[in-house]
């Protein structure tokens, strides 16, 4: 008799994806972050669902409904902080996952990589809209400043902004539609994530050496399921430590003040995971130029596969490219720091230099390092 997991139409799909999946025998802990992102997504959908049961998307009551969740709803405070800090964990895993893809040359799986970049964009949009929902000062002004960037688009910009706002300023209509989109987008993300996996399983996973591993594969279960469970436990431990000891450390104190259109906060800044892009935006004095740089800072990921010049796929045996990669990581950390600083000397010039370095590394220095390494190895 055939095993049910191999014959049942539905269970068969799960079996081929998570149980009998042939997996390279040498993938390291850097490959754990895909499953961690899946766990983060499930956690965000579940906590978000329970928050949506008590939240009211109305300018008059949104702020107090969040306070009500924290004070009056059973375990509402932990649900709210799991959701808020879960987003931070999501982005930490996401940045590591993308970094892994760049380091080990996983971007050569074009479809998987492109869907991943679309996923990144969708996630950023979802997180931005979620930040607006508590309707604190930073929520309101963040929404105003970021949506206003679209007015830099020639000819249609102003109309586009007013269309998104649903009026002449960020108001009730904006909050309602942001809540609607924030609710629906995670399900779209889930569909995209399944497509991402579908394309990945067409080619099979990459591995640290970047060499095809078809002759040396092992079943996903039990070897990698147990490894993933360890990663999940560590993620939950880190998240709970954050939620139970310092839940507000990554937030902005200004968001505990109800939104007031008549009073601008001294420093408007987004959540920490957008600060690198925000720093790039601010480093260009021209509005349209800044918006273009902001969009290109993420869109450059789409052209990375076409800038791969090395004869080797992975950076595992390429010390020069490794230096460039870690310089890029340091540069992104610098940009994140600059994004949270006021616009004054010396932060302006540091931000501009870091922004130039970011694009130079991706578009010029990393491809150049690949060419130099090929020549050194006489390939």
From Swiss-Prot:
Pfam families: Cytochrom_B_C, Cytochrome_B
Amino-acid positions noted as binding heme b b562 in the UniProt annotation, renumbered to this chain: 83, 182
GO cellular component terms given for this protein: mitochondrial inner membrane; respiratory chain complex III
Record bears the keyword Mitochondrion: yes
Gene3D superfamilies membership: Cytochrome Bc1 Complex, Chain C
Record-listed heme b b566 binding positions: 97, 196
TM spans (from-to): 33-53, 77-98, 113-133, 178-198, 226-246, 288-308, 320-340, 347-367
Subcellular localization: Mitochondrion inner membrane
Membrane protein topology class: Multi-pass membrane protein
Cofactor binding, per record: Binds 2 heme b groups non-covalently.
Keyword list, A-Z: Electron transport, Heme, Iron, Membrane, Metal-binding, Mitochondrion, Mitochondrion inner membrane, Respiratory chain, Transmembrane, Transmembrane helix, Transport, Ubiquinone
SUPFAM superfamilies xref list: a domain/subunit of cytochrome bc1 complex (Ubiquinol-cytochrome c reductase), Transmembrane di-heme cytochromes
Keyword Transmembrane helix included in the entry's annotation: yes
Protein function: Component of the ubiquinol-cytochrome c reductase complex (complex III or cytochrome b-c1 complex) that is part of the mitochondrial respiratory chain. The b-c1 complex mediates electron transfer from ubiquinol to cytochrome c. Contributes to the generation of a proton gradient across the mitochondrial membrane that is then used for ATP synthesis.
Family per record: Belongs to the cytochrome b family.
Protein name: Cytochrome b
